[in-house]
């Protein structure tokens, strides 16, 4: 995806009041997935979506009515607690579910009554590693980051001359 869609509209509001606060990290335009469980519960890890100061429990949300026909198969791996399986479905699946979640959490959504009981306060959860990370290569491309790190090793010359012309990648595991 090279452009943003209407789920990123700055004017979009949520029925989750805390998601509309100017200083929130998780407005309706930013719906990150994560792995959580209720603090001290010892229950199984679940996949959720942060919204305002809440987490939408996708295991509970998947069982609620009102989803379009193409959404339950996308929620199934998340309801089972498997973010890797969901990511393996590809970009179209992610965009489709993002749109469905945005509509469901938007102000005036007919799903509000069904989904409100699926919210858990972020302050009442503990977070876990969201997925199984097998391998990765990191590309060192942020000039501000590269400058800050370079100052640690070479305070007088933080960026080497080739930085802007030669991609720098390294194995991260």
Explain the meaning of each model-derived region.
Residues 39-44:
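Short, solvent-exposed loop/turn segments that connect beta-strands within catalytic domains
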Residues 6-38, 50, 57-173:
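Active-site microenvironments in enzyme catalytic cores
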Residues 45-49:
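Short beta-strand-centered aromatic/proline hotspots
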Residues 2-4:
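Helix-enriched interaction subdomains in cytosolic or periplasmic regions
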């Amino acid at each position: 995806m090279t452009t943003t869609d209407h789920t990123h509209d700055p004017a979009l509001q949520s029925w989750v009041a805390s998601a509309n606060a100017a200083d929130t990290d998780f407005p309706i335009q930013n719906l990150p997935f994560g792995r959580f469980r209720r603090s001290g519960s010892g229950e199984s890890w679940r996949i959720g979506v942060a919204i305002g100061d809440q987490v939408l429990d996708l295991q509970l949300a998947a069982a609620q009515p009102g989803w379009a026909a193409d959404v339950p198969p996308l929620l199934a791996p998340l309801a089972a607690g498997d973010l890797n399986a969901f990511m393996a479905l590809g970009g179209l699946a992610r965009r489709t579910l993002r749109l469905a979640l945005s509509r469901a959490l938007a102000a005036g959504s007919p799903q509000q009554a069904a989904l409100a009981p699926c919210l858990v306060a972020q302050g009442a959860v503990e977070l876990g590693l969201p997925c199984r990370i097998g391998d990765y290569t990191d590309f060192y491309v942020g000039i501000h980051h590269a400058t800050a790190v370079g100052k640690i090793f070479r305070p007088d010359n933080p960026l080497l001359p080739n930085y802007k012309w030669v991609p720098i990648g390294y194995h991260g595991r």
